[in-house]
C-alpha cells in the first residue's frame, strides 16, 4: 500500500530505488566486573587503536571525495580518540572499580554527552555528536561487533536509517546509493551537509521512516520538497522519473553558464566567488565558474595535527591557491579559531561561550608568535596572484590598526631578508559584529574592503544561537534589522570608493540574492555548488527593480513581509 511521509529537504534531486535498511547493530552487553583490570585496559586501548585506523581511512577517503573542509569532522573524531579528558577517566574506572571496558566507555561517554547536550551552544552540541559517534565505534570493537558499512552496497538503493553518522555518509558509494532518508537530523546536520557535497538526494527528520519501510520497498525521495513516497503507483513513479530527468536537464543547462558573466538583465556586473577550506577544494571552484575566492578559511591548515603549521607549509598552501586562480582575486581570512576548537598544541582556555570569547583576531593579536608566521607566509605568497587579506571578528578600529601594523612589520622584515612582496595587497575585515557594522563609516576610511559574515552577524544581532532549536525561529536572514545593517555597511564602503562582499550562507540564498543585489553588494561568495544557480538568477533580474525592492524591504516590520515582497518582485524572473 502506498504511503507518503514528510521530512526535511536536505539535498536536492530525485531518487527512485529499492529500500536498503541500515540496521543498527546489537551493542548490548552484560555489566560484569573484571578481575584482570590490566587486560581490560589493554582491550580498551586495542579498540581505540582499531578505531583510529578505521577513522583515518574514512577521513582520507572523505577528503578525496568531499574536500578537506568536509573531512575536518573526522579530524575532530580522531582528536576525541586522543583526548585525555575522556580516555583517562575510562581507564581509571576500569582500574579502580573493576568495571568492564564496555561499561566504563558507556558510562564516561554518556556523562560527557549529557553535559554537552544540556548546553545551548552549537559547538557543544557538535562535540556531543562527535563523542556519540566515536564511542559507538570503539564499543563495537570492544564487543567484536561489525558496524553497518554502506560501502558494501552493490545495487541501486535508497538508504533508510535512524540517522547517518558522518562516517556512514562518507562511505556512501555514489554509483549505487541513489538517496537516503533518516528519522532524525536537520538541514545543518553533518549528514545533510555531506549529502549535498556528494550530490545525493536526501530527506532527514522524518521521525518514523524506519518503522514505515521494509527492505525491498520501492522508495521515491524528493530532496527539493522533503517528500518520501513508499511503494507508489506506476503513474506516480513515472511523474517522478520525469521530475528527475528535468532536474538533470536543469543541471546541464546551468553548466552552460559556467563561463557566462554575472551581469543583470540591465547590465550591472557583480562578482560571484567561492568559499574554500584548502587547495583540495579548487577543482569544484573552477568547475563551477567562480570569478574568484571570496573566503579562504585558513584554520583547516591548523586542524588535525599535533603542532602548528610552519611558515613554509602555509606558504605552499597559499601559493597553490593563488597560482590555481590565475590572477583572479583570492580573499584569505587569517586564523579564525578559539576555544571551540581543540588544538593540542595551543593552550586555549575553556569558555562557557567560546563564540564570544578568546578567538580569531583577539587570539592572534594576543599571541603574535602564532600570527606572524601566517602573515609572513601570506606576504611571501602574494607575488603568485591577486591576494587580499581579511581579519576576522574585528570589533574595534584599534584591532584592525594593530593587525595591520604587525603585517607591515613583517613586510619590512621580509624585504630586508631579500623576499619579494606584492605592493597591491588589499586589507579588509570581516563584518560579523554589530559594533563593526555600526561604525562602518569609520572603518571604511581605513580598510580596503568589507566582507560581511552573515552567519555570525545574524546570531549576534538577534542574540540567537541558530543551532538551538528553541530559539532557531530568531535566526532570520531576511529580518529588516539585518538588511539595514547590510545596507549601512555597503553604503559606507561605497562612500569611500571601497567594495563590500558577503561570505555567509545568505550570499548564496535565492531569496536573499535579489535583496543584496538591490542593496548594492559587490561580491557574493558562496559554496561552489551554489554559483551557477546564483548566476542564472542574477542574469534574470534588473538591478533598478531590485533597488526598489530593497528600499521597500528595509521599511518592512518582519521577515515574512520581506519574503512576500521578494516573491512579488521575482515571480516572473
Curated annotation (Swiss-Prot):
It catalyses: L-histidyl-[protein] + phosphoenolpyruvate = N(pros)-phospho-L-histidyl-[protein] + pyruvate. GO terms for molecular function: kinase activity; metal ion binding; phosphoenolpyruvate-protein phosphotransferase activity. One of its GO terms (biological process) is phosphoenolpyruvate-dependent sugar phosphotransferase system. Signal peptide: none annotated. It is found in: Cytoplasm. Its EC number is 2.7.3.9. Mg(2+) binds at residues 432, 456. Its cofactor is Mg(2+). The N-terminal domain contains the HPr binding site, the central domain the pyrophosphate/phosphate carrier histidine, and the C-terminal domain the pyruvate binding site. This is Phosphoenolpyruvate-protein phosphotransferase.
